[in-house]
Amino acid sequence: MTERVVLAYSGGLDTSVAIGWIGAETGADVVALAVDVGQGGEDLEAIRQRALTCGAVESIVVDAREEFAESFVAPAIKSNALYMDRYPLISSLSRPVIVRHLVAAAREHGADAIAHGCTGKGNDQVRFEVGVAALAPGLSVLAPVRDSGMTRDKAIAFAEERGLPIDVSKKSPYSIDQNLWGRTAECGVLEDPWAQPPEDVFVYSADPTVARIPDEVTISFIDGVPVGLDGRSLPLADLVAELNVRAGAHGVGRIDLIEDRLVGIKSREIYECPAAITLLTAHRDLEDLTLERDVARFKRGIDQRWGEIVYDGLWYSPLKSALDAFVDSASAGVSGEVRIRLVGGVAQVVGRRSPASLYDHALATYDAGDQFDQRDARGFIELWGLPTKVWAAREQRLNP
């Protein structure tokens, strides 16, 4: 019988309801664990106290902002991680760090199970449970919201009946998840894919249609990782936080996506990720300047697969580790600066430079000083086109 459970606690509706459900259904003590991944908003001490009010025997808050940035966001930047070519894995990246701390807390507090507040329709249930299986296969997992069949309306009623201090109602039923890397919103009117998202859904970004004076930022990279902004060296967490404000002020990073979930359904998601889109745009441009052509071409496929397996909850997998090794090798030398203009919802690259640049002005220029010997082109074309020429001659011979 489960005697102690560590619950991944967010302070929201589902996990607050989960505390009461676990106690009622299993009789186990609940240790609530809230992991700070830069979500901001409500004070974490208030969240800690809420867990105790909802019935947890212990409530813990872990500051994982730097860890999240350095160990999870940085690899995503190096991998140009965009699921379906658009979504920068906001929630997908935070779940593995939460899992890491859940497992550590379970060991510290003698728990034999962990729990999460995910529904059966989402991706996070997979990310939590597969992550726990990879790090601590002996731990069992409880999913009270999913396994009790509790709908959102029922969860709201459960919270209201027991006087749980949750700020949610049937009139404003958005489900929000946010962290340093961005913000997600779903449910409510957003479930109609034809409905335009109300402006009050957006928090990280201003209306991009409102004219503003453009801003310009210069982002410094070393080996594919952002290390500075406008000539100032910054820890990655601080750099991302500042860019969220500056790029968000110009409406950068709003994404309205019909998303293919891992569980097989399509969902409508609203994302805000000003810093993520700005940094990924800058990083990809710097790669164009510094990576050899064949490496760059091959890496695009690696990047896509990297994003897919992270989205699918396989952060702690052998394939992910193997892909990381390639990305780390390819990223050596992706160093330099990228200048970005922020205006009208767009992060536009307007300049880039690198000590490892493969751009050779003397070869690229059409002006005086051109060192490219155009006479070499004739022989190159002859050899490059030779297989096609031989094939065409055969076709004419066989099909006159």
From Swiss-Prot:
Cell compartments where the protein resides: Cytoplasm
Gene3D superfamilies listed in its UniProt record: Argininosuccinate synthetase, chain A, domain 2, HUPs, Single helix bin
Alphabetically ordered keywords of this record: Amino-acid biosynthesis, Arginine biosynthesis, ATP-binding, Cytoplasm, Ligase, Nucleotide-binding
One of the record's GO molecular function terms: ATP binding
GO CC term, one of those recorded: cytoplasm
Enzyme Commission number, as recorded: 6.3.4.5
Disulfide bonds: none
UniProt-annotated binding residues for L-citrulline: Y87, S92, N123, R127, S175, E259, Y271
NCBIfam families membership: argG, PRK00509.1
Family: Belongs to the argininosuccinate synthase family. Type 1 subfamily.
PANTHER family: ARGININOSUCCINATE SYNTHASE
UniProt name for this protein: Argininosuccinate synthase
Species of origin: Frankia casuarinae (strain DSM 45818 / CECT 9043 / HFP020203 / CcI3)
Lineage, highest ranks first: Bacteria, Bacillati, Actinomycetota, Actinomycetes, Frankiales
